């Protein structure tokens, strides 16, 4: 007796899990057995195929955001991008560990994204791909950022790794395409720097796909009116990207280097600010109680000045020094503050200067590219704007050097102050003072007096911030993210070079000299530099974006479904680019007779070329239980579908008359049978693309498909959504409650247990069986059985015709065609 599963076992369950939070998005890695999920709690999760084991989770936070709207993998599978609606941010995350490698803000919440890789080959591109990046030879490797500061700086703090190279990935151009509300569409080279802003498209983007040959961009949008949505398909020409691909690749590579370096400089400044605030907090914590409890009207500065001049401390100051601070505590505090000062100094020397010099190098190379007007002027690259950006970077380097001099001066004063105070406290305790510590020159006294003047000057404007009683204004004023002038700018009196420049009108206006802003902070000059660089690199994005012209507009259908917007994230339509045949495919459903019928629209990526069978609808007829020779016939509605690979579509169907728990099917639909060259002339769309397709259902050719393998009944699960991965040969099915996940290996057959009498059935079941496009009637089957057996007896099997619940007992032989 044959024991058989409930359907032909083409797919094997390899993992199943009930998740605590509702899943709103899931997408397989293009290269690994990993699947990324986003849930309603704002978490991004990474799971492995084996038992659906969780690898890591990226929790929501204030910096990035809490409302994830979509996910996309970089084509090499090493980076994951996700969009956040509440902060309007895009975050790039390393697959190895949770953490933001790079993030940037966009103008509108992103509703969909697509990350593609260019597959076009040419001799110019090949030489560029193979050429070693000269910047690796000419520029020193950027120092890693210290790990003991904020988590935002950890992306550049990994030992023995180059995070910028990890961000940039392979030299081959890849583009992250973002779509959002109000026709918002932007293209980011290497997922980092904007190279195009598309205009002229109305509505909210539901899906988009940039072809791998860079010839066209497909977009599906919806425009809501009177409680319903009009869904339309657009195809835009992107010939400028295609025609200037080598130039776009070189330019984009430079853009992303510049973008990563700006982030590196920002993070270096963040670390410097944290080191500065650490000094303030440590001193403030010691002085606050003293100021609150002292009975005298003198200031902290006066108390220390009195001790310096007369060698005698007031009772309040002596209590502060001996009871709250102590000699041991002073020594520890001095070491800690000196360490913070040294950290700021080191960050300026090794990080700010290195990053700025690298930035200067890449901008200079970009200026060289812009000088080749024949190649780069059509892309909007402007040499004059880049020259202005180079000048702004030079000003930033000058300001960083100025800060370095201020830090060096403050360090001298700081060391002199703590040495003097240490000796004073030893005398108060009548401890022995070493002779070398007891010596104090007039210069040392001047340093101490300067330290007291600079750092203990109570500033009312600081009372609501850190540094109320102790401020490091000479250093801190450079790190404040404000537009105010410096409180104590550097003294330029007697500086012969400065005086010479001020008196020479020719040199003041010379493009060879970087402008100097003596009264502005480092943060101000940095912001100015960023704005100028952004403006300089914004022009190519505008030029390329305006070149993308709408070539095709096809109204698809009117959607009146009142579903939760979160659940719509999974819904049709679904776009796919076949890189081999250069075709755009669009999967969508049309409501007909209360059923959702799947339609496939395909267009050539080259707008000037046409394709046969451009629109076809699929009707699912019957499913054969090959091991029991039974047929499942019913009425099926398409719930979800995605491309598994270039040749196959994975579909989730609902049996509208099946009983609960046995009414969902997972199906693999080969496109080779949908687009059969032998009868393609019979399946031509006879309507017009200028009218909504759901109003022309009768004009859409419908092919009825009947399956004998590559399908499975999804028992005990209200399957609703599917995500397939042809590279790893897996699919993930999600239930309608968005919590129940089941993972299948799609190309592995389950083993069956057979008794001795089942040899014949086993042999028949192992024969390759094709998917039928047409079920024969009983009379046709009887007439053709003998002839078919004579011609090819191995492809004739017996099939029982049953109702949807398999109750009929009539049987007939059936020829598989």
Curated annotation (Swiss-Prot):
Protein name, per record: Anaphase-promoting complex subunit 4
Pfam families hit by this protein: ANAPC4, ANAPC4_WD40, WD40_APC4_C-half
Organism: Pongo abelii
Annotated compartments: Nucleus
Protein function: Component of the anaphase promoting complex/cyclosome (APC/C), a cell cycle-regulated E3 ubiquitin ligase that controls progression through mitosis and the G1 phase of the cell cycle. The APC/C complex acts by mediating ubiquitination and subsequent degradation of target proteins: it mainly mediates the formation of 'Lys-11'-linked polyubiquitin chains and, to a lower extent, the formation of 'Lys-48'- and 'Lys-63'-linked polyubiquitin chains. The APC/C complex catalyzes assembly of branched 'Lys-11'-/'Lys-48'-linked branched ubiquitin chains on target proteins.
Residue numbers of Phosphotyrosine PTMs: 469
Keyword Cell cycle: yes
Covalent link location (Glycyl lysine isopeptide (Lys-Gly) (interchain with G-Cter in SUMO2)): 772, 798
Annotated GO CC locations: anaphase-promoting complex; nuclear periphery; nucleus
Modified residues (Phosphoserine): 757-758, 777, 779
GO process annotations (BP): anaphase-promoting complex-dependent catabolic process; cell division; protein branched polyubiquitination; protein K11-linked ubiquitination; protein K48-linked ubiquitination; regulation of mitotic metaphase/anaphase transition
Gene assigned in the entry: ANAPC4
UniProt keyword annotations, A-Z: Cell cycle, Cell division, Isopeptide bond, Mitosis, Nucleus, Phosphoprotein, Ubl conjugation, Ubl conjugation pathway
Pathway: Protein modification; protein ubiquitination
Family in the record: Belongs to the APC4 family.
Assembly and interaction partners: The mammalian APC/C is composed at least of 14 distinct subunits ANAPC1, ANAPC2, CDC27/APC3, ANAPC4, ANAPC5, CDC16/APC6, ANAPC7, CDC23/APC8, ANAPC10, ANAPC11, CDC26/APC12, ANAPC13, ANAPC15 and ANAPC16 that assemble into a complex of at least 19 chains with a combined molecular mass of around 1.2 MDa; APC/C interacts with FZR1 and FBXO5. In the context of the APC/C complex, directly interacts with UBE2S.
